[in-house]
A protein has these predicted regions:
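Conserved donor-binding/catalytic core segment of Leloir-type glycosyltransferases
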Residues: 10, 151, 187-205, 211-215, ...
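A charged, aromatic-enriched C-terminal amphipathic alpha-helix characteristic of glycosyltransferases
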Residues: 335-363
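Aromatic "clamp/platform" in nucleotide-sugar-dependent glycosyltransferases that forms part
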Residues: 275
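Carbohydrate-associated surface elements
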Residues: 156, 175
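Conserved acidic donor-binding segment of nucleotide-sugar-dependent glycosyltransferases
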Residues: 307-308, 312-318, 326-332
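Short hydrophobic beta-strand element within catalytic cores of glycosyltransferases
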Residues: 292-295
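Nucleotide-activated donor-binding/catalytic signature segment of Leloir-type glycosyltransferases, i.e.
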Residues: 239-258
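Membrane-proximal helix-turn-helix segments that form the acceptor-binding/catalytic region
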Residues: 28-30, 75-79, 117, 130-150
Length: 365
């Protein structure tokens, strides 16, 4: 298909991109480029503005990043939509959708729902953001209801939009590149039991709950280690846990994907204590390495983890501690759940071309 014949698509998100793109993102946008004439309006990872002809990345100012982004977004969208002559605009949250609707471009507006928009103000950011939660809830609902189409990523997120009277146009996960995790067969569980957490150290990931659970579980698991990988605003919680349990807790701020795959091979299970998840990519990564999950049964986690089949689901921090003790002291249980985890991973795998094809079906009027 020639460039002139491709549908003109504008993607809008507050996502922070770095140029050049990582190999994984490059594959995703290359596949989208086969189907669409794509432009992206997002934010810059390094804080400065960039425009390479496909990605227009706006700069960021400390403390004012969020407010400025949304205040200026309708004007930026209107300008870029006109330049690009966009036939459709896809947003990665209902909040961006409202800004796009205010721009009144005439293009179709499609919302991608990656999670519960109501948690954005309650579990991310400052007390001020939590204070405006009721207003933000209402604004997000307007974005979902007024959009021309809504694409969800899981049964959980589909349920969220149906609860406010909207039927999703499609349900499929965002493209996730699992090549490094599925490239080789899983290895047996390690002889020395260990648990692994991989994620940002933020409120919605319930890092505080993880620390509480490990303090309860560790005395019952002599010689067993919790390995934490991540960085974020709750780092002080992890630092204190490492000080309190230095022989049973390690912390690494950042690993490459290949190193995360290796860390999973060296663990008996993944632990995911999140308070909210739209999907939970790290669960699929763990499953591909044949590692079961001990996780909170919230949001999209329950769409992936089947209690007693490929992991253990819990409802509280105390239950999380008990489940960790149970799995890390019962080799037979761990091996049975590990086998179930590897089988469960297959349903979540997709190629870049397959993802782009499904996006084309949603974008088509």
């Amino acid at each position: 298909m020639t460039e002139s014949a491709k549908p003109r698509l504008l993607l809008v998100a507050r996502t922070r991109y770095e140029l050049p793109l990582s190999p994984s993102l490059a594959r995703k946008f290359s596949a989208l480029g086969e189907r669409f004439d794509v432009r992206v309006l997002a934010t810059s990872a390094d804080g400065g503005p960039h425009d390479d002809g496909t990605f227009r990345l706006v700069g960021r100012l400390p403390l004012l990043d969020g407010p400025l982004f949304y205040v200026l977004l309708p004007f930026r969208v209107r300008r870029l939509a006109r330049e690009h002559r966009a036939a459709a605009i896809v947003t990665q949250s209902p909040y961006e959708a409202v800004s796009v609707l205010l721009a009144r471009t005439g293009a179709r507006v499609i919302v991608e729902l990656h999670g519960d928009w109501r948690t954005a103000t309650r579990l991310y950011g400052s007390p001020l953001r939590r204070a405006i939660a009721p207003l933000a809830d209402a604004v997000g609902a307007i974005g979902v209801r007024r959009a021309d189409a809504v694409r969800t990523i899981s049964p959980y997120t589909s349920g969220l939009v149906r609860a406010i009277g909207v039927e999703p146009a499609a349900e499929f996960p965002a493209f996730m590149d699992f090549e490094l995790f599925g490239a080789r067969p899983p290895v047996p569980l390690p002889a020395a039991p260990a648990a692994l957490f991989v994620g940002v150290l933020e409120l919605y990931k319930n890092v505080d709950g993880l620390a509480k659970a490990w303090r309860l579980a560790a005395p019952q698991l002599p010689g067993v280690e919790l390995r934490i990988v991540g960085r974020g605003s709750r780092r002080d919680v992890v630092e204190e846990l490492v000080r309190d349990l230095p022989a049973q807790t390690t912390w690494t701020e950042r690993l490459t994907q290949a190193e995360v795959a290796q860390a999973l091979d060296e663990a008996s299970c993944l632990v995911l204590p999140s308070r909210s998840e739209g999907f939970g990519r790290v669960l699929v990564e763990a499953f591909l390495r044949g590692r079961p999950a001990v996780a909170m049964g919230v949001g999209g986690i329950s769409d992936i983890v089947e209690d007693g089949s490929n992991g253990l689901l819990v409802a509280s921090d105390d239950e999380l501690a008990a489940a960790l003790v149970r799995l890390l002291t019962d080799r037979e249980l761990a091996e049975r759940l590990a086998a179930g985890a590897r089988q469960a991973a297959e349903r979540w795998l997709a190629t870049p071309a397959g993802y782009a094809e499904r996006m084309a079906a949603v974008v088509a009027p």
